[in-house]
Structures are given as C-alpha cells and as structure tokens.
Amino acid sequence: GAAGSMLGSGAIVVMDETTDAVKAAARIVRFFSRESCGKCTPCREGTTWEEDILNRMLSGKGRPGDIETLLKAASNISPGVYPVAAWEEGGLVAVPFPPKQTTICPLGPSSVAPIASAIRRFRSEFEAKIDEAAHATIEVSVGGGS
C-alpha cells in the first residue's frame, strides 16, 4: 500500500522455553509448502527443500551444512531480503520493502521470514539437531549367533 506495508500479513508466534524451535519451524514451512500452487519454481522447490531438510533434522538425520542449505534455499526464494552478513552481526535486520519479486504472489517470499527468524534466534537448537544425528549410534549384531 501507500504506507509501504503489507497490512494483514504479519504474525506473532509466542512460544515458551519448552517449545522445540526446529519442530515449530517445520510446521510453519509445511504450511507454506502445502499452500504453494506450484507455478513458481522458487516457491515450489524452495519450500519443499526447506520442509525436507527440517524433517530430516527432526528425524535425527540432520547433516552438517543443513543450516546453510536452509538459508540458501530462503535466499533463492526471496533474494536480498535477509542478508546473511547482517545475521552474523546479531542486530536487527532492515527488510527492504517490497522484497525482490521472484514469484507470482507473496506466498514464497513470506515463507522466508519464519525460517530466517527461527535460525537467527534459535540457531543453537538447529545445531543441536545436527549434533544429535552425528552422535547417533546404531546397534549392529555381530556373528550369526542363535
């Protein structure tokens, strides 16, 4: 609009300290992935990648590099909206409005904010999921015992 806002598109999610931030992010991304009409490659592919990676992390199979891949997928959906360098500084990030248009509608670019915020604010929880996968043990029977 004339005010440079997207009135009606904002959301505030309140979670307590018992909430699994990775699980919450996965549920939000699942919404965007399911709501995508599939016409735009950045939205269709990007949200699917994000959902797959988060589900892999939740299933205990997270991989080193998954966080960076999530951020890369987000930047492919809506380039330039959340510069990685600003995340590393830990300060507030100015979000340009309107975002660069890579999709027909704002659904894809809207999917970037929840993932970016979750990683920025709860990165240690994402890293813990990857560490859990790295330290997982698998029981293997040895020998042909009867």
Role assignments for model-derived ranges:
Residues 1-146:
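Redox cofactor-anchoring modules in respiratory/redox and cofactor-processing assemblies
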